[in-house]
């Protein structure tokens, strides 16, 4: 995470809410030859985090039992020094909000995979209201069986979470106001204004 302590984010509940809202991670997996990255939906399951991958994913053979690092980015955007109140001797930067989840990956059974699919659907279909929500009941049993044959579910347990909220906290209130009024990400602008 960012080495400057003013950007540390230690609110575990807020980080979990962020992960739940984003619902997608880049999961870094060590191998003997080279690190690999799994791009996967992520859901909270108690103190752990669940994800699934295609059985054909080249990182899959290395997942079970591996110490992995999942990176969840809630937003990021370029910051121009022209937006600061004090423009002299300023350089461009990047603001972002990110959560790292470090833990041990463990293969889950089919029941956990089905529960994960249902949870993912429940969370993300709710954001699409007023459309009728998709549920697994809308798909034939044979289609579900085929899908299950193509993917595997994993849990990241024994978790350590770290967060960074780099939202121009190291700048003056006037500089932050300038960034918030110009930054391309409405979410980051809202977070900067809330500081």
What are these regions (language model features)?
Residues 1-26:
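Short, basic/aromatic recognition patches
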Residues 16, 90, 143-146:
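A generic local secondary-structure boundary/capping motif
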Residues 21-55:
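Short beta-strand segments
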Residues 22-24, 65-68, 151:
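Short, surface-exposed beta-edge/turn micro-motifs
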Residues 29, 53, 72-74, 158, ...:
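Pocket-edge structural micro-motifs
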Residues 41, 52, 71, 104, ...:
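Residue-level recognition of well-ordered beta-strand positions that form the cores
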Residues 55-119:
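Short, structured beta-strand-loop surface elements
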Residues 106-195:
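C-terminal edge-of-domain segments
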């Amino acid at each position: 995470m960012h080495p400057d302590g003013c950007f540390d984010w230690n609110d575990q509940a807020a980080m979990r809410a962020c992960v739940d809202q984003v619902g997608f991670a880049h999961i870094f997996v060590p191998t003997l030859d080279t690190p690999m990255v799994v791009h996967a939906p992520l859901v909270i399951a108690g103190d752990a985090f669940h994800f699934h991958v295609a059985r054909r994913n080249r990182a899959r053979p290395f997942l079970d039992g591996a110490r992995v690092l999942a990176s969840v980015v809630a937003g990021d955007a370029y910051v121009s020094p022209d937006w600061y109140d004090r423009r002299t001797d300023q350089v461009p930067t990047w603001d972002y909000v990110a959560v790292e989840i470090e833990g041990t990956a463990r293969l889950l059974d089919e029941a956990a995979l089905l529960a994960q699919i249902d949870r993912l659907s429940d969370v993300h279909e709710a954001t699409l209201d007023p459309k009728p929500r998709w549920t697994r009941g809308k798909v034939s049993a044979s289609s579900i069986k085929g899908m299950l044959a193509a993917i595997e579910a994993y849990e990241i347990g024994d978790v350590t979470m770290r967060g960074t909220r780099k939202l121009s906290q190291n700048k003056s209130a006037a500089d932050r106001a300038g960034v918030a009024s110009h930054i391309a990400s409405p979410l980051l602008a809202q977070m900067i204004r809330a500081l």
